[in-house]
Structure formats: C-alpha cells, structure tokens
Amino acid sequence: MRKIEFFDTSLRDGEQTPGVIFSIAEKVTIAKQLEKWGISVIEAGFPAASPDSFEAVKQISKALKETAVTALARCVITDIDKAVEAVREAQHPQIHVFIATSPIHMKYKFKISPDEVLKTIDKCVRHAHEQVEVVEFSPEDATRTEPEFLLKAVQTAVDAGATYINIPDTVGYTTPEEYGKIFKMLIDNIKADREIIFSPHCHDDLGMAVANSLAAIKAGAGRVEGTVNGIGERAGNAAIEEIAVALHIRKDYYQAKSPLVLAETMATAELISQFSGIAIPKNKAVVGANAFAHESGIHQDGVLKNAETYEIISPELVGIKHNSLPLGKLSGRHAFTEKLTELNISYDAKELPNLFERFKRLADKKKEITDADIHALFTGETVKNLAGFILNNVQIDGHKALVELKNQDAEIYVSQGEGSGSVDAIFQAIDKVFNYQLKLISYSVDAVTNGIDAQATTVVSVENLATGTIFNAKGVDYDVLKGSAIAYMNANVLVQKENSQGKVEQISAHDGI
C-alpha cells in the first residue's frame, strides 16, 4: 500500500488568513508539534517576504530533526538565495519555487509570454537545484492553465532538476473529476530518469479542497499539501487532518495511507486554533466539538449498544481521551511534569518554574485542573510572552480601568481609561500607553475548558489605520477581563512592530500558490 507524504503549509499559506500572525516562538512550537504528528515536510515560510519570515524558517530549520523543512520562493534568483540561506541548517532541506502559468496570470499579472515563463522556470529551478538537492516546482493557477502548456512547464521543471511537482488549485476552481484527470495526464506523459512525485495543493473556495486532494491521491499523487484546520486565505486550504483520517478510514478505496500519528491530531488542531485565534467550528469534521456528539435518541441508543452504528471514527483515533490524571492545588511539580509528558507537551526546562507557578495560581482558582486547562495554560504562556510588553495588573472600578504594563526594558507604564463598560475602559487605558490609530474590528471570548471556572481565550481583531493591515491577537486567562487586556496589548505590540519596521509582509500576501 502506498504511503503518502504529508506537506504542511500552515505556517506559510495558513498565515495568509486575514489577521493571523504567528510569532517566531509560536511557529517553532507549532513546527515541533507537526513533527510529532508525523508531517513529512513543513513549509516554514517565505523568507524573502520579511526579516521575521526569514528568521522563522531559520529557527525551525535548526529545531527539527526528522521532518524536512522547505521554504517558498518566487521564480526570482534573489528569492531563491534567501530561501536557500534560511534552510541551510535543516537536517533535510528543500526549496519550493513557483511561477504562474495560466493565461490570465501571464497576461495581466506578469505581462510576459509563455516562452519567457518557460525560460524562467528552467533558469530558476536549475539555480535552486544547484544549491539544494530536493526542489519542488509549482505552476501557480495550474487548474486554469491550458493542458498543453502545463505539460511543457512541468517537463521544463523536471528537466531542470525538480523532484516534486505540485499542482495548485490556486483559486479553488477545479472539481475532483477534472483534477484527477490533470494528474493522470501529467503522470502518464512526463518523461524523467528518476522518480517524480506529484502533489495537490487545494483551496476551498467551492468547498471541494479535501475532495480534490483525495481525487489527486486516487489518480497517483504521492504527496499532499494542506493546512491544519484548513486555515488559509479566502475560504482556506485543504484540511490535513480530514485527508489523513479519510485515508485511514477508506484505505480500502484509496489503497494509500498517511504517515501521521493520528492520536496527535486533536492536540495539533487545538494548538493551531489557540495560536491563530480561530476557533474550531463545532460541526467541523474530525476535530469539531460535535464530531462525536449524538442528539437523536435513536442515534444515542445505537451508539450505546455499539459505537460503530453511528461512529465511523472513534474519538480515541484522533486523540480525544478521558482525563486520566486530574490535577489540583495539592499536586506537586512531579505530577505537573508527568502530566506534560502524558500530553506530549514540549517545553524548555528553563520555562518550567514559570509554568509551574502559573499552574499553582490556576489551581488556587479551580477545584480540578483538566487536560484542556493544561493545554490552555501552555499556549497562554506563549501568547503572554509576545515580545514587547507584559501585563502586570488590571483594576476595574465600574466604567473605569487602571492598567499597568511593563516593557522589555522593565519600564512600567500606568494608565487609566474610562469607557462604556469594563472592556472598553481597559482598551481606552491601553490606547493611552501606545497612542496608535487602531480600529477594533471584532472581539470574542471562547471558553477553552469546561465549567464555571473555565479558562478562556479572548481574541481581538484590529486594523492598523496607518497601513490597513489587520491583526488578530490573543489573551488566555481564567479572568476574562485580564485576558481581554492581554489580547489588546498584544494587538498594539503587533502594530508597534509594523510601524517601526515597515509593513510586515513586504511581498504581497497574494504572491503564493
């Protein structure tokens, strides 16, 4: 049975979701979890886009041991050189180059001829292959490219040294039947003296990203690309967890399997949700809260008698398990570290005293600490440590608020605000510290643990009126007002960074596949 490689682009294409900005520390944490999950290759970023993107790829390259790391580059020599430099320290480096091949992109986006595109492919793939052995080529907007020219473009890339050929459905235009035919045409006609592995990269504009990806695998693709929870610009990307579970449940049909440790699926999905600030829809396949819930009495009766009557996926398969070792205020450091090990949570030993101290403070507030609490505690710590400012204190008196912030130079800022309510007052006080022109687009609170004493994630979306950039920022705390203050403070830190360094993404977010 064929083993399909899984290529995760949550850190690159997923970060193109409006408002989603992962810090470098968050990206490294996510990458380590993706490696634990069994992902074959991680697209860590677009190094030419910004200094932060370059540094993130570099740090991830150093951190991973088994999973390959790739970096995206346009078919531009300087882009490729940046990508090569960024992955230089990876154990298994790869480079991913792309150029658009559809008539509409060549005519209106690049204003170049098909012959010029072919020459550029040959030049840039050769340049990449001279420096890194494994090169992937993507003809952007492949599904709207004329078949004859698509074949020429792919053959040119293969002749120049590409080992992987990715066929992006950039605008989510194709259907499963059409997409399968494209793969069959390429697999049957591309000439090479070595194995060439084809992969789908699907967007979900028509709601068919996962179906299209599976159709490509059925047609012979050996690798599949996607993101955790299907995050991505517009309607998102193919959800990797859905593809992996579909291959597992229907291996009889696809005759293929994934390399993923499926028991790590829920932990991975929750981590991405926490760091992106995008809640997992309750009715989402595989990882949604309702995926294993049964309202109908007939269904409930059937499941109680035999779970397979209405469940084709067991909760345990994707890592949903009962809280086997609950913690409380009397639990010691050993029990806490044992729980981190049980939950497969990676952490730096230097972080342990601070994490344990936060655990003890939480235990004073909650009678019983659940697994979800521990995950929230861990992700909240990463969010809290967003470089720039720390919330020392927040006090509320009716419609008035006092906040105390500390910057990375240990300078203390105390500010007061007055608003229509407690949250508005907090935001007004924080505005006086930073004094940026922001527009609050959305504010939401989502309980990440159960019970009246639950921890919650507060997410704010703000627009930097100086640039038009939208940022999502998070705050995790059992005190909703404190979580709100952390989230809004972090949003201001992101705006501060953009205003001081110039636009975070100097290359358009639409420069991708």
Curated annotation (Swiss-Prot):
Its cofactor is Mn(2+). Pathway: Amino-acid biosynthesis; L-leucine biosynthesis; L-leucine from 3-methyl-2-oxobutanoate: step 1/4. It is found in: Cytoplasm. SMART domains: LeuA_dimer. It is an enzyme of class 2 (transferase). Coiled coil: none annotated. Catalyzes the condensation of the acetyl group of acetyl-CoA with 3-methyl-2-oxobutanoate (2-ketoisovalerate) to form 3-carboxy-3-hydroxy-4-methylpentanoate (2-isopropylmalate). PANTHER family: 2-ISOPROPYLMALATE SYNTHASE 1, CHLOROPLASTIC-RELATED (PTHR10277:SF9), HOMOCITRATE SYNTHASE-RELATED (PTHR10277). This is 2-isopropylmalate synthase. It comes from Lactococcus lactis subsp. cremoris (strain SK11).
